[in-house]
Amino acid sequence: MPSSISWGLLLLAGLCCLAPGSLAGDAQETDASKDDHEHPACHKIAPNLAEFAFDLYRVLARQSNTTNIFFSPVSVATALAALSLGTKGDTHTQILEGLDFNLTEMAETDIHQGFQHLLQTLNRPNNQLQLTTGNGLFIDQSLKLADKFLEDVKNLYHSEAFSTNFTDSEEAKKQINGYVEKGTQGKIVDAVKTLDKNTVFALVNYIFFKGKWEKPFEVEHTTEGDFHVDQATTVKVPMMNRLGRFDLLYCTTLASWVLQMDYLGNATAIFLLPDEGKLQHLEDTITKEILSKFLKNRHTRTVNLYFPKLSITGTYDLRSVLSTLGITKVFSNEADLSGVTEEAPLKLSKGVHKAVLTIDERGTEAAGVTVLEAIPMSLPPDVRFDRPFLIIIYEHYTKSPLFVGKVVNPTQ
């Protein structure tokens, strides 16, 4: 590799913590949130984000069908779109087309304004839902970034810029990891394991989400249960249980149960439980159009629900994943990042994405809360999430998939 080429690092971190809560009788929609429903900017890019989410999911699923998957399409797409502001030529086109944008159908200004509004909306204070994102730009002291790039990533992507001494890789690593740890409230530590000596800049994106269930589980109803990883493997997990009314339907197209559980605030978790032997069919068949139908047509029924407590982590080298989606130039010696800086040729050395998911019934917010529901006299069906299933965390105002994943083994 020519010594004149310096390296950049793309680091993306996501944390999704699903905690209990209570029914909020006084939850009112603010004027600001009403405006969001009518604001077209982030809605323009929402279908592309959903398409990208499923594209990325399928690439990861093909890499391994025996491991958990968890990632934030919003985090990955935001960082790449921000980086695209400093790219030119094929490098530029590959990134935006890899994010499922058709540049003949959508103006580039609309794309960046869409992300700008998305980030503004997601970061709006909400006392019911903790949701924050951050973009950090770590720049070597010897490197001067182009003024336009710096201005654009600050204005459109709310980026913070930090001066970093990359010649001291341990100190640089500590600075970057500290930024991520603080942004994810201590949940993601040591996001960067190693830094190459040629690294001169790092673009770091994090997303932190902590949601409280509208209808929490009771801790005393959690008991040990079986989770069937595959035909040959069964593991013991803490299985939460609640008898009540849930948004649940059976989809014959997907051969799956579809459960929607709302958070206090403006987000929903969608869990898809395929029939035995139908996981591959579900992965191949699910689309953004089918997902949209579920969100619009909800069916409430009484169910005895069993759901595993879990904490899973997804860590990915995005270089191999993104190359499958056609994003290759930015990682090669042919990369054109001249919009970032003209001082030295740059390429992206690697892209790292780490996301953590925790689902439980705990939390002081749920203490002393009682939710009473009318239950019919006939015995309701049991629905047990005791085999591999998919999860999508969806934010309603922006119509965005915040997180996507697959739980194969809750104990991993």
UniProtKB/Swiss-Prot annotation:
Expression across tissues: Plasma.
One of the protein's GO biological processes: acute-phase response
UniProt GO cellular component terms: extracellular space
CDD domains: serpinA1_A1AT
Function: Inhibitor of serine proteases.
Family named by the database record: Belongs to the serpin family.
Domain topic, free-text comment: The reactive center loop (RCL) extends out from the body of the protein and directs binding to the target protease. The protease cleaves the serpin at the reactive site within the RCL, establishing a covalent linkage between the carboxyl group of the serpin reactive site and the serine hydroxyl of the protease. The resulting inactive serpin-protease complex is highly stable.
Name of the molecule in the record: Alpha-1-antiproteinase
